[in-house]
Amino acid sequence: IYLALTLYALHQQGHTLPGDDMNRQGVGLGQAVRRLVPQGEDPADSSIQRRFNALATAAQTREIAQHLRGMIQLLRAAEVPLGYAQLAKDLFYLQFPDSASQVRLRWGQDFYAIPSENDQIEEETNYG
């Protein structure tokens, strides 16, 4: 939980207005990171995908934290929100081998899912 809170604080820096909350329920890590891929670019060819893979395959908590900090800085720069309650749960379950693979699978599925038209409209409306 501590890591999720510190990452939220990092993400929230510079966002002081009430509508600028970078915590968005229902936005998983994979989905948020996917929004960093430039429109029209294949996610598989993206530098974001390489960073995402490094995060998803990290085995040690310290390594996961390091990769997450870098990813959160990218999300902050692009003003892409993330669901921090889900991230806290994910970080908890990553500690256990039986559930870690499920967390990584969901992250990957969310990253590679084709965004719906509603997601694209919301993204254009909210993020530029």
Which residue stretches match the model-derived regions?
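Short linear sequence motifs
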Residues: 1-3, 45, 100, 104-105
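Aromatic- and glycine-enriched beta-alpha-beta binding-site module
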Residues: 1-35
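Generic hydrophobic, helix-prone segments enriched in Leu/Val/Ile
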Residues: 8, 64-68, 111
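Residue-level detector of solvent-exposed, low-hydrophobicity positions
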Residues: 9, 14-15, 36, 59, ...
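Conserved binding-pocket/active-site segment within a compact domain
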Residues: 22-94
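Alpha-helical oligomerization segments
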Residues: 73-128
